[in-house]
Curated annotation (Swiss-Prot):
NCBIfam families: tsf (TIGR00116). The gene is tsf. SUPFAM superfamilies: Elongation factor Ts (EF-Ts), dimerisation domain (SSF54713), UBA-like (SSF46934). This is Elongation factor Ts. It comes from the Bacteria. Transmembrane segments: none annotated. Its main location: cytoplasm.
């Protein structure tokens, strides 16, 4: 197996315009074989999708999903380049799958890690730095542990980082790239909203003292 060097990854990226992580994964999967790695990226729809990623995706559709029991609902905006593609079965299927994904992932609040405000990342760091299991550890080791934990936590909040509910061997970002490759257009998840029945409503129950008094009176 050829060593997967940074130079090899860059060479594959230059040939396919795919992302660095996708290129590295392709080379690992194909034991460093360049031709097989290129074919692997094409089969995944990644290479062609990356080449189109600079084009503006201003069309698309807003999809909805209501979970069984009508207790959770999702609205999601998915963009593409043309109205023709937006009406197609592949795009509409992706829109529904993504809406279902949001409904199934209560921790997800943002489309990507890049969208998470710095204030939230700082708050997570503050929480992790204060954990008891880190006390007494050298600062350098503590910093690495905290960095890893924060990275994991932020990924849990991002839709594109989630394992796809219908195929956990890929994440949502890879799913979007695959469909974009098949369609031949850039696809972008712009935003979503999740509604949970009763969320934020404070249920008023009887005052405990009054309840006891009513039971003992008379």
């Amino acid at each position: 197996m050829a060593e997967i060097t940074a130079k090899l990854v860059k060479e594959l990226r230059d040939k396919t315009s795919a992302g660095m992580m996708d290129c590295k994964k392709a080379l690992i999967e194909n034991k460093g074989d360049m031709d097989k790695s290129i074919e692997w990226l094409r089969q995944k729809g990644i290479a062609s999708a990356e080449k189109k990623s600079g084009r503006v995706a201003a069309e698309g559709a807003v999809g909805s999903y209501i979970h069984t029991g009508s207790r959770v609902g999702v609205l999601l905006e998915l963009n593409c380049e043309t109205d023709f593609v937006a009406r197609g079965d592949l795009f509409q299927g992706l829109l529904r799958d993504l809406s279902m994904q949001v409904a199934a992932c209560p921790s997800v609040e943002y489309v990507s890690v890049d969208q998470i405000p710095e204030s939230i990342a700082n708050k997570e760091k503050e929480i992790e730095m204060g954990r008891d299991d880190l006390s007494g550890k050298p600062d350098q080791i503590k910093a690495k542990i905290v960095e890893g934990r924060i990275g994991k936590r932020l990924k849990e909040m991002a839709l594109l980082e989630q394992p796809f509910i219908k195929d956990s061997s890929i994440n949502v970002e890879e799913l979007v790239k695959q469909v974009a490759g098949k369609i031949g257009e850039n696809i972008r998840v712009r935003r979503f909203t999740r509604y949970i029945l009763g969320e934020g409503i404070e249920v008023q129950g009887p005052d405990f003292a009054e309840e006891v008094a009513s039971m003992t009176s008379g």
